[in-house]
Amino acid sequence: AVAKLLAAADVTAALEGCKADDSFNHKVFFQKTGLAKKSNEELEAIFKILDQDKSGFIEDEELELFLQNFSAGARTLTKTETETFLKAGDSDGDGKIGVDEFQKLVKA
């Protein structure tokens, strides 16, 4: 669903760059996919897709499945990748990423 908002070639390249376990780097991924150039409104729409349980936050279970939002056949993130991703985005320390935190993380 997220892939519809991005160029297919960019998504493919970004996913290729993190096929191996523990190779995911959110900053690189956001740059390669073009997410880093999206407006806050576009990022909010993407956030709502990533927030699969519609809680208003992206929790670790949803982060683990992050890549699959871009391609159904993509791998899940490892525990280490998920923890690193969460730590990078969770600026208030509540153990989850809100929409404002997500926007800041993507644009960082």
UniProtKB/Swiss-Prot annotation:
GO terms for cellular component: cytoplasm. Keywords: Acetylation, Calcium, Metal-binding, Muscle protein, Repeat. The modification N-acetylalanine is found at residue 1. Belongs to the parvalbumin family. Ca(2+) 1 binds at residues 51, 53, 55, 57, 59, 62. In muscle, parvalbumin is thought to be involved in relaxation after contraction. It binds two calcium ions. Residues 38-73, 77-108 form the EF-hand domain. Ca(2+) 2 binds at residues 90, 92, 94, 96, 101. GO terms for molecular function: calcium ion binding. Pfam families: EF-hand_7 (PF13499). This is the predominant parvalbumin in latimeria muscle. InterPro entries: EF-hand-dom_pair, EF_Hand_1_Ca_BS, EF_hand_dom, Parvalbumin. Disulfide bonds: none annotated. This is Parvalbumin beta.
